[in-house]
Protein backbone atom coordinates (compact mmCIF):
# COMPACT_ATOMS: atom_id res chain seq x y z
CA UNK A 1 0.00 0.00 0.00
CA UNK A 2 1.46 3.37 -1.02
CA UNK A 3 1.78 6.34 1.37
CA UNK A 4 -1.09 8.12 -0.47
CA UNK A 5 -3.47 5.17 -0.03
CA UNK A 6 -2.67 5.07 3.70
CA UNK A 7 -3.60 8.76 4.09
CA UNK A 8 -6.86 8.32 2.15
CA UNK A 9 -7.77 5.27 4.22
CA UNK A 10 -7.34 7.24 7.46
CA UNK A 11 -9.41 10.15 6.14
CA UNK A 12 -12.40 7.87 5.48
CA UNK A 13 -12.82 6.99 9.16
CA UNK A 14 -16.30 8.09 10.27
CA UNK A 15 -17.13 8.67 13.91
CA UNK A 16 -19.85 6.41 15.26
CA UNK A 17 -21.07 9.26 17.51
CA UNK A 18 -23.66 11.49 15.85
CA UNK A 19 -24.26 15.05 16.95
CA UNK A 20 -27.77 15.23 18.32
CA UNK A 21 -29.72 18.50 18.07
CA UNK A 22 -32.78 18.70 20.34
CA UNK A 23 -36.08 19.00 18.50
CA UNK A 24 -37.56 22.49 18.34
CA UNK A 25 -34.28 24.42 18.67
CA UNK A 26 -34.47 25.67 15.08
CA UNK A 27 -37.43 26.66 12.95
CA UNK A 28 -37.99 28.06 9.46
CA UNK A 29 -39.72 31.31 8.53
CA UNK A 30 -42.88 30.54 6.56
CA UNK A 31 -42.24 33.57 4.33
CA UNK A 32 -38.51 33.96 3.58
CA UNK A 33 -37.65 30.36 4.62
CA UNK A 34 -34.66 31.51 6.67
CA UNK A 35 -33.65 29.08 9.42
CA UNK A 36 -34.18 30.81 12.77
CA UNK A 37 -33.21 30.09 16.35
CA UNK A 38 -36.55 29.33 18.02
CA UNK A 39 -35.72 31.07 21.31
CA UNK A 40 -34.84 34.26 19.41
CA UNK A 41 -38.09 34.04 17.44
CA UNK A 42 -40.08 33.70 20.68
CA UNK A 43 -38.35 36.75 22.16
CA UNK A 44 -39.32 38.62 18.99
CA UNK A 45 -43.00 37.64 19.48
CA UNK A 46 -43.01 35.22 16.53
CA UNK A 47 -41.95 37.97 14.10
CA UNK A 48 -39.17 36.94 11.70
CA UNK A 49 -36.08 39.10 12.41
CA UNK A 50 -34.96 38.67 8.79
CA UNK A 51 -38.07 39.65 6.78
CA UNK A 52 -40.47 41.00 9.46
CA UNK A 53 -43.08 38.34 8.64
CA UNK A 54 -45.69 38.01 11.41
CA UNK A 55 -46.15 34.30 12.04
CA UNK A 56 -49.23 32.86 13.70
CA UNK A 57 -49.11 33.06 17.48
CA UNK A 58 -50.73 30.88 20.15
CA UNK A 59 -53.70 32.61 21.79
CA UNK A 60 -52.57 32.08 25.38
CA UNK A 61 -49.03 33.29 24.69
CA UNK A 62 -50.40 36.32 22.84
CA UNK A 63 -52.47 37.36 25.86
CA UNK A 64 -49.70 36.64 28.35
CA UNK A 65 -47.23 38.78 26.41
CA UNK A 66 -49.82 41.52 25.78
CA UNK A 67 -51.18 41.94 29.32
CA UNK A 68 -49.07 43.06 32.27
CA UNK A 69 -47.59 40.35 34.46
CA UNK A 70 -49.66 39.35 37.49
CA UNK A 71 -53.40 39.68 38.14
CA UNK A 72 -54.32 37.86 34.92
CA UNK A 73 -57.58 35.94 35.38
CA UNK A 74 -58.98 33.61 32.72
CA UNK A 75 -62.69 33.94 31.89
CA UNK A 76 -64.92 31.00 30.93
CA UNK A 77 -62.09 28.48 31.08
CA UNK A 78 -64.48 25.81 32.39
CA UNK A 79 -66.67 25.91 29.26
CA UNK A 80 -66.22 23.03 26.80
CA UNK A 81 -67.88 22.30 23.42
CA UNK A 82 -70.76 19.82 23.25
CA UNK A 83 -71.87 17.70 20.30
CA UNK A 84 -75.59 18.41 20.65
CA UNK A 85 -76.31 17.65 16.97
CA UNK A 86 -74.35 14.35 16.97
CA UNK A 87 -72.67 15.72 13.84
CA UNK A 88 -70.60 13.49 11.62
CA UNK A 89 -68.82 14.18 8.33
CA UNK A 90 -65.68 12.18 7.56
CA UNK A 91 -65.20 12.11 11.36
CA UNK A 92 -67.45 12.50 14.37
CA UNK A 93 -67.48 16.01 15.80
CA UNK A 94 -66.56 14.55 19.21
CA UNK A 95 -63.42 13.07 17.68
CA UNK A 96 -62.51 16.38 16.06
CA UNK A 97 -62.94 18.18 19.39
CA UNK A 98 -60.72 15.67 21.20
CA UNK A 99 -58.02 15.89 18.51
CA UNK A 100 -58.10 19.70 18.51
CA UNK A 101 -57.88 19.86 22.30
CA UNK A 102 -54.90 17.52 22.30
CA UNK A 103 -52.99 19.34 19.54
CA UNK A 104 -53.72 22.91 20.71
CA UNK A 105 -53.73 22.44 24.47
CA UNK A 106 -56.94 24.49 24.70
CA UNK A 107 -60.56 23.47 25.35
CA UNK A 108 -61.87 25.67 22.52
CA UNK A 109 -60.85 28.32 20.02
CA UNK A 110 -61.05 31.45 22.20
CA UNK A 111 -59.08 32.38 25.32
CA UNK A 112 -60.32 35.35 27.38
CA UNK A 113 -58.59 37.08 30.30
CA UNK A 114 -59.00 40.15 32.44
CA UNK A 115 -55.95 41.97 33.71
CA UNK A 116 -54.04 45.18 33.14
CA UNK A 117 -52.30 46.84 30.20
CA UNK A 118 -49.64 49.41 31.14
CA UNK A 119 -51.31 49.73 34.53
CA UNK A 120 -54.85 50.19 33.13
CA UNK A 121 -57.63 47.63 33.76
CA UNK A 122 -58.57 45.75 30.59
CA UNK A 123 -60.27 42.61 29.29
CA UNK A 124 -58.66 40.85 26.32
CA UNK A 125 -59.41 37.74 24.29
CA UNK A 126 -57.61 35.93 21.48
CA UNK A 127 -58.54 33.23 18.98
CA UNK A 128 -56.56 29.98 18.89
CA UNK A 129 -56.22 29.19 15.18
CA UNK A 130 -54.77 25.73 15.79
CA UNK A 131 -58.11 24.70 17.34
CA UNK A 132 -60.21 23.79 14.28
CA UNK A 133 -59.02 26.85 12.37
CA UNK A 134 -60.14 29.22 15.14
CA UNK A 135 -63.74 28.51 14.14
CA UNK A 136 -66.52 30.17 16.13
CA UNK A 137 -68.91 27.82 17.92
CA UNK A 138 -71.11 28.07 21.01
CA UNK A 139 -68.22 28.13 23.49
CA UNK A 140 -66.39 30.85 21.56
CA UNK A 141 -69.56 32.96 21.58
CA UNK A 142 -70.16 32.33 25.29
CA UNK A 143 -66.58 33.20 26.25
CA UNK A 144 -66.66 36.37 24.16
CA UNK A 145 -69.91 37.47 25.82
CA UNK A 146 -68.34 36.81 29.23
CA UNK A 147 -65.42 39.01 28.20
CA UNK A 148 -67.85 41.79 27.24
CA UNK A 149 -69.71 41.43 30.54
CA UNK A 150 -66.43 41.51 32.48
CA UNK A 151 -65.45 44.72 30.68
CA UNK A 152 -68.78 46.29 31.64
CA UNK A 153 -68.47 45.13 35.27
CA UNK A 154 -64.96 46.56 35.53
CA UNK A 155 -65.80 49.65 33.47
CA UNK A 156 -62.84 49.06 31.17
CA UNK A 157 -61.94 48.54 27.51
CA UNK A 158 -62.16 45.25 25.59
CA UNK A 159 -59.52 44.10 23.10
CA UNK A 160 -59.93 41.08 20.82
CA UNK A 161 -57.26 39.43 18.65
CA UNK A 162 -59.01 37.58 15.82
CA UNK A 163 -57.56 34.61 13.92
CA UNK A 164 -60.32 32.49 12.46
CA UNK A 165 -61.62 30.75 9.38
CA UNK A 166 -65.21 31.64 10.32
CA UNK A 167 -68.23 29.90 11.82
CA UNK A 168 -67.87 26.24 12.86
CA UNK A 169 -69.60 24.02 10.32
CA UNK A 170 -70.15 21.15 12.78
CA UNK A 171 -72.41 23.29 15.00
CA UNK A 172 -74.58 24.51 12.11
CA UNK A 173 -77.20 27.09 13.17
CA UNK A 174 -75.87 27.27 16.74
CA UNK A 175 -72.58 28.47 15.30
CA UNK A 176 -74.18 31.06 13.01
CA UNK A 177 -76.21 32.34 15.96
CA UNK A 178 -72.96 33.44 17.63
CA UNK A 179 -72.57 36.16 15.00
CA UNK A 180 -75.73 37.87 16.27
CA UNK A 181 -74.97 37.03 19.91
CA UNK A 182 -71.51 38.59 19.90
CA UNK A 183 -72.68 41.62 17.91
CA UNK A 184 -75.53 42.24 20.39
CA UNK A 185 -73.07 42.01 23.30
CA UNK A 186 -70.82 44.61 21.67
CA UNK A 187 -73.82 46.90 21.23
CA UNK A 188 -74.38 46.75 25.01
CA UNK A 189 -70.69 47.58 25.56
CA UNK A 190 -70.96 50.54 23.21
CA UNK A 191 -74.14 51.77 24.94
CA UNK A 192 -72.16 51.95 28.18
CA UNK A 193 -69.54 54.11 26.48
CA UNK A 194 -66.72 51.57 26.74
CA UNK A 195 -64.27 51.09 23.83
CA UNK A 196 -63.78 47.88 21.86
CA UNK A 197 -60.52 47.57 19.96
CA UNK A 198 -60.41 44.81 17.36
CA UNK A 199 -57.02 43.50 16.23
CA UNK A 200 -57.24 41.34 13.12
CA UNK A 201 -54.39 38.90 12.65
CA UNK A 202 -53.68 36.39 9.89
CA UNK A 203 -56.19 35.05 8.94
CA UNK A 204 -59.50 36.67 9.92
CA UNK A 205 -62.19 35.34 7.60
CA UNK A 206 -65.82 34.22 7.29
CA UNK A 207 -68.38 34.71 10.04
CA UNK A 208 -65.86 36.16 12.48
CA UNK A 209 -64.84 38.93 10.08
CA UNK A 210 -68.54 39.50 9.28
CA UNK A 211 -69.41 40.01 12.95
CA UNK A 212 -67.28 40.88 15.98
CA UNK A 213 -63.94 41.43 14.19
CA UNK A 214 -65.16 44.39 12.13
CA UNK A 215 -67.20 46.02 14.92
CA UNK A 216 -64.33 47.68 16.75
CA UNK A 217 -64.41 51.35 17.65
CA UNK A 218 -60.89 51.08 16.25
CA UNK A 219 -60.02 48.28 13.84
CA UNK A 220 -56.34 47.33 13.68
CA UNK A 221 -54.62 44.88 11.34
CA UNK A 222 -51.27 43.17 11.75
CA UNK A 223 -48.90 43.57 8.77
CA UNK A 224 -49.95 41.52 5.72
CA UNK A 225 -52.78 39.78 7.59
CA UNK A 226 -55.41 38.09 5.40
CA UNK A 227 -58.77 39.70 6.25
CA UNK A 228 -62.06 39.13 4.44
CA UNK A 229 -65.25 37.10 4.17
CA UNK A 230 -65.03 34.71 1.22
CA UNK A 231 -61.72 33.49 -0.17
CA UNK A 232 -60.01 35.05 -3.19
CA UNK A 233 -60.69 32.08 -5.49
CA UNK A 234 -64.41 31.99 -4.61
CA UNK A 235 -64.77 35.71 -5.32
CA UNK A 236 -62.92 35.47 -8.65
CA UNK A 237 -65.14 32.57 -9.75
CA UNK A 238 -68.26 34.51 -8.74
CA UNK A 239 -67.47 37.89 -10.32
CA UNK A 240 -65.40 36.33 -13.15
CA UNK A 241 -62.66 38.92 -12.78
CA UNK A 242 -59.06 38.86 -11.63
CA UNK A 243 -58.64 40.56 -8.27
CA UNK A 244 -55.83 43.10 -7.69
CA UNK A 245 -52.50 42.18 -6.12
CA UNK A 246 -52.60 42.16 -2.34
CA UNK A 247 -56.40 41.93 -2.26
CA UNK A 248 -57.70 41.18 1.27
CA UNK A 249 -54.36 41.94 2.89
CA UNK A 250 -54.33 44.49 5.70
CA UNK A 251 -52.38 47.04 3.60
CA UNK A 252 -55.08 46.86 0.90
CA UNK A 253 -57.84 47.25 3.51
CA UNK A 254 -56.11 50.26 5.08
CA UNK A 255 -55.73 51.92 1.69
CA UNK A 256 -59.46 51.46 1.04
CA UNK A 257 -60.63 52.57 4.49
CA UNK A 258 -61.76 49.18 5.82
CA UNK A 259 -59.40 49.30 8.83
CA UNK A 260 -57.98 52.21 10.79
CA UNK A 261 -54.31 51.30 11.15
CA UNK A 262 -51.65 48.61 10.84
CA UNK A 263 -49.57 47.95 13.95
CA UNK A 264 -46.44 45.84 14.28
CA UNK A 265 -46.95 43.13 16.90
CA UNK A 266 -43.88 44.28 18.83
CA UNK A 267 -45.46 47.73 19.26
CA UNK A 268 -48.97 46.47 20.04
CA UNK A 269 -48.85 46.97 23.81
CA UNK A 270 -47.84 50.61 23.57
CA UNK A 271 -50.08 51.53 20.63
CA UNK A 272 -53.21 49.87 22.02
CA UNK A 273 -52.41 51.18 25.50
CA UNK A 274 -52.14 54.71 24.12
CA UNK A 275 -55.47 54.38 22.33
CA UNK A 276 -57.23 53.06 25.43
CA UNK A 277 -55.74 55.84 27.58
CA UNK A 278 -57.14 58.45 25.19
CA UNK A 279 -60.54 56.79 24.76
CA UNK A 280 -61.06 56.28 28.50
CA UNK A 281 -59.24 59.43 29.68
CA UNK A 282 -56.97 57.24 31.77
CA UNK A 283 -53.62 58.69 32.77
CA UNK A 284 -51.07 55.91 33.06
CA UNK A 285 -47.39 56.73 33.74
CA UNK A 286 -46.38 53.90 31.39
CA UNK A 287 -48.26 55.31 28.38
CA UNK A 288 -46.28 57.63 26.13
CA UNK A 289 -47.41 59.56 23.08
CA UNK A 290 -46.99 57.80 19.76
CA UNK A 291 -44.76 60.70 18.67
CA UNK A 292 -42.49 60.41 21.73
CA UNK A 293 -39.50 58.12 22.06
CA UNK A 294 -40.71 54.83 23.54
CA UNK A 295 -39.61 54.15 27.10
CA UNK A 296 -38.26 50.75 28.06
CA UNK A 297 -41.03 49.94 30.55
CA UNK A 298 -43.82 50.61 28.07
CA UNK A 299 -42.37 48.34 25.39
CA UNK A 300 -41.15 45.54 27.63
CA UNK A 301 -42.82 42.21 26.97
CA UNK A 302 -44.21 40.29 29.98
CA UNK A 303 -43.05 36.73 30.51
CA UNK A 304 -45.40 34.01 29.24
CA UNK A 305 -46.07 30.81 31.14
CA UNK A 306 -44.71 27.53 29.75
CA UNK A 307 -48.20 26.52 28.59
CA UNK A 308 -48.34 29.58 26.30
Curated annotation (Swiss-Prot):
Residues 25-294 form the CoA carboxyltransferase N-terminal domain. One of its GO terms (molecular function) is carboxyl- or carbamoyltransferase activity. It is found in: Cytoplasm. Its EC number is 2.1.3.15. A zinc finger (C4-type) spans 29-51. It catalyses: N(6)-carboxybiotinyl-L-lysyl-[protein] + acetyl-CoA = N(6)-biotinyl-L-lysyl-[protein] + malonyl-CoA. Gene3D superfamilies: 2-enoyl-CoA Hydratase, Chain A, domain 1. One of its GO terms (cellular component) is acetate CoA-transferase complex. Zn(2+) binds at residues 29, 32, 48, 51. Binds 1 zinc ion per subunit. One of its GO terms (biological process) is fatty acid biosynthetic process. Keywords: ATP-binding, Cytoplasm, Fatty acid biosynthesis, Fatty acid metabolism, Lipid biosynthesis, Lipid metabolism, Metal-binding, Nucleotide-binding, Transferase, Zinc, Zinc-finger. Its cofactor is Zn(2+). Pathway: Lipid metabolism; malonyl-CoA biosynthesis; malonyl-CoA from acetyl-CoA: step 1/1. The keyword Cell inner membrane does not apply. Belongs to the AccD/PCCB family. Component of the acetyl coenzyme A carboxylase (ACC) complex. Biotin carboxylase (BC) catalyzes the carboxylation of biotin on its carrier protein (BCCP) and then the CO(2) group is transferred by the transcarboxylase to acetyl-CoA to form malonyl-CoA. Acetyl-CoA carboxylase is a heterohexamer composed of biotin carboxyl carrier protein (AccB), biotin carboxylase (AccC) and two subunits each of ACCase subunit alpha (AccA) and ACCase subunit beta (AccD). This is Acetyl-coenzyme A carboxylase carboxyl transferase subunit beta. It comes from Vibrio vulnificus (strain YJ016). The lineage of its organism: Bacteria, Pseudomonadati, Pseudomonadota, Gammaproteobacteria, Vibrionales. The gene is accD.
Amino acid sequence: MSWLEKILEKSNIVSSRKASIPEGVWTKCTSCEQVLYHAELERNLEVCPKCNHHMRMKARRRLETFLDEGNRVELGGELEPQDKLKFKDSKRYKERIAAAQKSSGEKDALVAMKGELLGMPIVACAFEFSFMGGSMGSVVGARFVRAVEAAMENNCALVCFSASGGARMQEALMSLMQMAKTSAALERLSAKGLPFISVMTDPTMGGVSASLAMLGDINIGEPKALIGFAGRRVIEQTVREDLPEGFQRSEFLLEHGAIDMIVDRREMRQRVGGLIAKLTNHKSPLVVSVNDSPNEAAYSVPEANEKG
